[in-house]
């Protein structure tokens, strides 16, 4: 049970046994070691982003099936997630974008959390335009200053939720590049994607905040625009953070999470599958298609 999240911050909390079906629960309670069955429920938090949802539900499914432990999932905004894991309300989060995107959040809690490992590397973020926008007209942030470009883009950058690190960096980018005629449309991942879908379908110009890994790069032909001042940052890695006593309280789950490594190509394929089916089905397919990878994560615990 979470102790400090308010109803305004807490978006969704579910127990994986209910989410992923009775069969997994029966398997967990009857076919696995007694030690695992007696362990406390693992509480994992994630932000409402496609990559965070996929990797968190994947970790939850593996912990449930292989360790026989119940998993509770909490979806909320970024700031409450960092606060939750630092206070011990959450056992772990699998979406700490570093060294730039979440630098402010991490800096406030780094002495109160443990880093279990890096789940994937080579993550990146920036602003994108559709491939049908000529590169001769828009190649970099500087090109957005052109009056004719600003007019075609309606002076708007399609953004994501207010608490995202990318939102903070994008607001700073508007200042760094003196893009005074632009506004950042703060919304959500879903809102940004809806705006992109509408514009792309009608071949209208747009510029949007974006990050990779993300399934949108498989659905749409998009192009990053150059950021010569590095206002948005460069390549990032995504870490797993846990509360301070998690490794001693639940060494099996902590060890499993510390071994989780996902190649970006595999992650993007899984996220794409989730768009065609559901995250639960895509997670089940990922586990079936990557037995050696899962075996490495589980080690001697499963």
Task: Describe these PLM feature segments.
Residues 33-44, 146-154, 293-302:
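Immediate post-signal peptide segment of exported/extracytoplasmic ligand-binding proteins
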Residues 38-51, 69-74, 154-158, 257:
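Short, well-ordered beta-strand elements
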Residues 94-109, 198-223:
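A ligand-binding cleft/hinge motif common to bilobed small-molecule-binding domains
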């Amino acid at each position: 049970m979470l102790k400090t999240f308010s109803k305004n911050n807490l978006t969704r909390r579910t127990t994986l046994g209910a989410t992923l079906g009775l069969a997994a629960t029966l398997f967990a309670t009857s076919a696995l070691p007694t030690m695992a069955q007696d362990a406390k429920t693992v509480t994992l938090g994630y932000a409402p982003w496609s990559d965070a949802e996929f990797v968190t539900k994947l970790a939850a499914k593996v912990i449930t099936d292989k360790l026989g432990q119940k998993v509770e999932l909490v979806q909320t905004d970024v700031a409450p997630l960092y606060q939750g894991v630092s206070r011990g309300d959450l056992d772990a989060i699998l979406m700490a974008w570093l060294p730039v995107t979440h630098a402010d959040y991490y800096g406030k809690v780094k002495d109160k959390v443990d880093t279990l490992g890096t789940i994937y590397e080579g993550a990146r973020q920036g602003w994108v335009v559709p491939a049908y926008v000529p590169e001769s007209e828009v190649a970099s942030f500087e090109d957005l200053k052109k009056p004719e470009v600003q007019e075609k883009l309606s002076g708007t950058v399609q953004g994501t939720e207010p608490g995202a690190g990318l939102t903070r960096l994008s607001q700073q980018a508007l200042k760094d590049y003196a893009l005074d005629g632009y506004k950042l449309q703060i919304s959500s991942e879903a809102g940004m994607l809806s705006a992109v879908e509408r514009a792309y379908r009608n071949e209208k110009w747009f510029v949007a905040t974006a990050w990779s890994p993300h399934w949108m790069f498989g659905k749409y032909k998009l192009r990053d625009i150059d950021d010569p001042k590095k206002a948005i940052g460069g390549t990032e890695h995504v870490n797993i953070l846990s509360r301070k006593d998690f490794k001693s309280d639940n060494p099996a789950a902590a060890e499993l999470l510390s071994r989780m490594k996902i190649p970006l190509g595999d992650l993007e394929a899984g996220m794409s599958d989730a768009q065609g089916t559901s995250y639960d089905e895509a997670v089940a397919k990922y586990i079936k298609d990557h037995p050696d990878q899962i075996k490495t994560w589980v080690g001697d615990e499963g």
